[in-house]
Design a protein with these regions (language model features):
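Conserved alpha/beta enzyme-core scaffold
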Residues: 1-522
Length: 522
């Protein structure tokens, strides 16, 4: 079946998953459904302890068995130890056919690849994957389909019962003996625990894993004791130097600075740039530079940001500290400055991933965005974006909040260099669609700026602005003229992954990379 972005979704995949093909960004607006519910085991006896000796003990008490779904969060980023720690014990116990439902997986989790190859892990559901896990999926070593969801889409899948978590393992920088978890106050602080909140609410069993047990009550709790079955104290839940790598610094790359300046000039010439506007940006060099340059103009003009949203970096926190931002609303901290800010600034708030981006609740924060500044591996002439699959066909990234914020914001801006190395980032067709062009308004490159023809209002308000505007086709043609038209990636027929739109429909599939055979030279 051909979906709304022109991608062919095999009928057998639709049948196997019980899914529909993507129909459009707002196809499920005003949709009514009934939420799922976990199985809860009560605790009335005040003498019964939640503390367990180790991960093995936690698994046994939770009734671990073949075929279960285990969940994890990624707030520790590349410093995470929890996934590997748990899966090593699952493997040692001889448990098979496990599905990992994680908010994201990274290179820190490369050690679990052998467990994919031996059948300990047969399913992965995540925002995305990097490193050797991505290679394992792309080369067909995962038994079942990998399912990629946005941050909002993951919450939707859990709350609707599409995914049922048997055991959630939640790494907590601090926790008390009854399970009240906080993201701060320990030796492995990560700022917030937003992605894990839905796991705690909907999993049948919840295990808090901490390296800093604190006196009861650990308040204010990010995750409450009422949702926690067991508490496991371990030596380390993460490497703090990789959880927070220090203050994000502005880029010195001239090309990125130029794109950031283009972005800022575009933003301030829209009708949305006014007192109390809302804004989200990513952690990339150009995005950080655009936040800094925007802050200077805000200060000059006396304009305040009403809401700063999303994954938070130090430059946004500095704007908050200067009084240029009224409220920061946070689902992930990317550096030490952001972690310190949420500890100390009363106008810096933690929210759940559902509040942030769930398309199946009664209204998420992303719907209130004026601007979102995003990056992309590829953008095609229909403004579709690819943030998951590399130009070599390998799964190498994550949807994150990309489709969620693009769908919600009044003005979605994607910053991408015209070329990624020798590979055109602006192309005829992206390798894989992860964010539909329907929700992308502007593409800013180092060689020009293209406005989506759907947005005639933006085209009109930019007619007298001195910026290098062109069509998206002209950008594509410039890229191809410089490095040639790229050869398409060669894939097998086998589908190894599904890219879900945030509403749970299938926007694209990922196929196995074709094996190459080389003939011996005679």
């Amino acid at each position: 079946m051909i979906n709304a972005v022109g991608r062919e979704i095999p009928e057998e995949i639709l049948k196997a998953t019980g899914k529909e093909a993507f129909k459009g960004v707002y196809a499920y607006d005003d949709y009514e459904y009934k939420k799922a519910a976990p199985t809860v085991r009560t605790l009335n006896d005040p003498t019964r302890s939640k503390l367990v000796e180790n991960i093995h003990d936690a698994l046994v008490k939770c009734g671990i068995k073949d075929g279960m779904v285990l969940s994890f969060h990624h707030h520790f980023r590349e410093g995470d130890y929890v996934v590997n720690m748990v899966m090593e014990e699952v493997h040692r116990m001889g448990i098979k056919d496990i599905t990992i439902c994680a908010s994201s997986l990274g290179k820190a989790h490369d050690p679990i690849v052998p467990y994919i190859e031996d059948g300990t892990i047969t399913g992965i559901q995540s925002s995305g994957v990097r490193g050797k896990i991505g290679e394992a999926i792309s080369t067909g070593r995962l038994k079942n389909l990998a399912i990629m969801r946005s941050h909002g889409g993951r919450v939707r899948a859990i709350e609707s019962g599409e995914v049922h978590i048997d055991i959630a393992f939640i790494g907590a920088p601090t926790c008390d003996e009854y399970g009240n978890m906080r993201a701060n106050g320990g030796k492995s602080d990560c700022g917030v625990l937003s992605y894990a909140m839905v796991d705690a609410q909907y999993a049948d069993k919840v295990v808090a894993v901490t390296d800093c047990l604190v006196p009861f009550p650990n308040l204010p709790a990010s995750i409450s004791m009422v949702n926690v079955d067991y508490v496991c104290v371990v030596d380390e839940i993460g490497n703090p130097t990789k959880i927070a790598t220090g203050a994000a610094k502005p880029t010195t790359d001239v090309r990125k600075i130029m794109m950031a300046d283009y972005c800022t000039k575009f933003v301030v010439n829209t009708p949305y740039f006014k007192e109390g506007f809302s804004y989200q940006t990513g952690v990339g060099g150009a995005s950080i530079a655009s936040t800094i340059s925007l802050g200077k103009i805000m200060e000059e003009r006396g304009i305040h940001m009403g809401l700063g949203l999303g994954g938070i970096t130090t430059p946004m926190c500095e704007l908050l500290a200067k009084g240029l931002v009224n409220k920061l609303v946070d689902t992930q901290d990317f550096d030490q400055g952001a972690i310190e800010s949420i500890k100390t600034n009363p106008n810096h708030f933690e929210i759940s991933a559902s509040e942030y981006a769930n398309p199946f609740n009664k209204g998420a924060y992303v719907n209130k965005l004026d601007f979102v500044i995003l990056a992309s591996l590829e953008v095609d002439v229909n403004f579709n974006c690819n943030v998951v699959v590399g130009s070599d066909g390998m799964i190498t990234g994550a949807q994150g909040g990309h489709p969620d914020t693009a769908a919600g914001a009044k003005c979605t801006i994607v910053i991408a260099p015209l070329l990624q190395g020798r590979i055109p980032a602006i192309c005829t067709n992206v390798t894989t669609v992860t964010t539909p062009g329907e929700s992308v308004d502007v593409v800013i490159t180092d060689y020009g700026i293209a406005i989506n023809p759907r947005r005639q209002d933006l085209i009109e308000c930019m007619k007298d602005v001195d910026l290098p505007f062109c069509t998206i086709e002209e950008l594509r043609d410039k890229a191809y003229a410089m490095v040639g038209t790229p050869d398409p990636v060669q894939f097998d027929d086998r589908v190894v992954g599904v890219i879900e739109a945030r509403d749970g429909t299938i926007i694209d599939v990922v196929r196995k990379i074709k094996d190459y055979e080389f003939e011996d030279e005679q």
